[in-house]
Amino acid sequence: MTRTVKCRKYNEELPGLDRPPYPGAKGQDIFEHISQKAWKEWQDHQTMLINEKRLNMMNAEDRKFIQAEMDKFFAGEDYAQAEGYVPPSN
């Protein structure tokens, strides 16, 4: 049986992650409140940000930027986009 969570991003019950994606409290919070759907969308968006903004994940400032954008993404706030990117309309 698939584990479900009340997804923070979509505000509905959706299938949850199989395990926390990070160690510690942040990973546990994501595990308990973020759906597989929202996590996959974040991973795709994160990849686009890293590539388009040429971020280096070895750089502490770039990691802080990605962390802050992830928090905004899941909270439904305005978050950074790749310049010129227009999301597909559903």
From Swiss-Prot:
A Pfam family matched in the record: Iron_traffic
Keywords on record: Iron
Keyword Iron: yes
Similarity section: Belongs to the Fe(2+)-trafficking protein family.
GO terms for cellular component: cytosol
GO biological process, one term: cellular response to oxidative stress
Keyword Flavoprotein part of the UniProt annotation: no
Name listed for the protein in its UniProt record: Probable Fe(2+)-trafficking protein
UniProt xrefs under NCBIfam families: PRK05408.1
GO terms, molecular function: iron ion binding
Record organism: Pseudomonas entomophila (strain L48)
Function: Could be a mediator in iron transactions between iron acquisition and iron-requiring processes, such as synthesis and/or repair of Fe-S clusters in biosynthetic enzymes.
